[in-house]
Curated annotation (Swiss-Prot):
It is found in: Nucleus; Cell projection, Pseudopodium. This is Myozenin-1. Belongs to the myozenin family. It comes from the Eukaryota. The modification Phosphoserine is found at residue 82. Residues 118-128 have a biased composition (Low complexity). InterPro entries: MYOZ. Its main location: nucleus. GO terms for cellular component: actin cytoskeleton; nucleus; pseudopodium; Z disc. It comes from Bos taurus. GO terms for molecular function: actin binding; FATZ binding; telethonin binding. Residues 136-162 have a biased composition (Gly residues).
Length: 297
């Protein structure tokens, strides 16, 4: 007799053919693009800092802006065109040339006896960009690139300089641009030149003669009554009462009984009643018949 109600559905067995196709297809599809695998932690950090989606990247960007603002506000004369003449003493003597628009200087030194053109420039805040140019050939010559200092060529507007082509440069050598964008505020205030800095030894811990401070009268730490002390003494109407002090009498020394047995005990431990030390006699009648039976029984 069949049971009443809806019969349970038959459980279908999952086919393993589909699983085999998926596992086998992964080996054949070698052209699948899974993206770039970043294995260097530095790339990951730079990518996260450039997204500006989390709090850390925003704080990093604000810190960069604060640093640039601090450098520009504390040394505004360094980045102005009118003050670039002061940097002439920092330029090397070999092939040096100052650029005013790009705010940098360039020099070149070659091993083949010649000097090749070298240029460089700094950005808005004096970024130390270095441009290398390898010169090859024979002969000697000297010159400056069309973008020297960022003023003589197309590299002047964007803050980048250019160098001479290979066919115009003579000798072989490595050209490096050096930027002097930091000036110590101590050296700037004292007017010390680089030559004097080597010869002169400055001891910043040596203190000079201390100037004598003016002797001002301080009213903050003095408790002065209203009107001064003279008026305050006249307004004083309270007088201390006069009383006769009797002779000083020494208090009698009280000796307490140090017998520990007579001292009361305030311990919380339940202690039974103790005797006072006197012998206690109990009269017990021991005239009991030895028989177990008496006359009453």
């Amino acid at each position: 007799m069949p049971l009443s109600g809806t019969p349970a559905p038959n459980k279908k067995r999952k086919s393993s053919k589909l699983i085999m196709e998926l596992t086998g297809g992964g080996q054949e599809s070698s052209g699948l693009n899974l993206g770039k695998k970043i294995s260097v932690p530095r790339d990951v950090m730079l990518e996260e800092l450039s997204l500006l989606t989390n709090r850390g990247s925003k704080m990093f960007k604000l810190r960069q802006l604060r640093v640039e603002k601090f450098i520009y506000e504390n040394h505004p004369d360094v980045f102005s065109d009118s003050s670039m003449d002061r940097f002439q003493k920092f330029i090397p003597t070999v092939g040096g040339q100052l650029g005013t628009a790009g705010q940098g200087f360039s020099y070149s030194k070659s091993s083949g006896g010649g000097q090749a053109g070298r240029s460089g420039s700094a950005g808005q805040y004096g970024s130390d960009q270095q441009h290398h140019h390898q010169g090859s050939g024979s002969g000697s010559g000297s010159g400056s690139g069309p973008g020297s200092g960022g003023a003589g060529g197309p590299g002047g507007h964007s803050g980048r300089g250019g160098a001479l082509p290979d066919n115009q440069a003579g000798g072989e050598g490595k050209h490096i641009t050096v930027f002097k964008t930091y000036i110590s505020p101590w050296e700037k205030a004292m007017g010390i030149d680089p030559q004097q800095k080597v010869e002169l030894g400055i001891d910043l811990l040596a203190y000079g003669a201390k100037a004598e401070l003016p002797k001002y009268k301080s009213f903050n730490r003095t408790a002065m009554p209203y009107g001064g002390y003279e008026k305050a003494s006249k307004r004083m109407t309270f007088q201390m009462p006069k009383f006769d002090l009797g002779p000083l009498l020494s208090e009698p020394l009280v000796l307490y009984n140090q017998n520990l047995s007579n001292r009361p005990s305030f311990n919380r431990t339940p202690i039974p009643w103790l005797s006072s030390g006197e012998p206690v006699d109990y009269n017990v009648d021991i005239s009991i018949p030895l028989d177990g039976e008496t006359e009453e029984l």
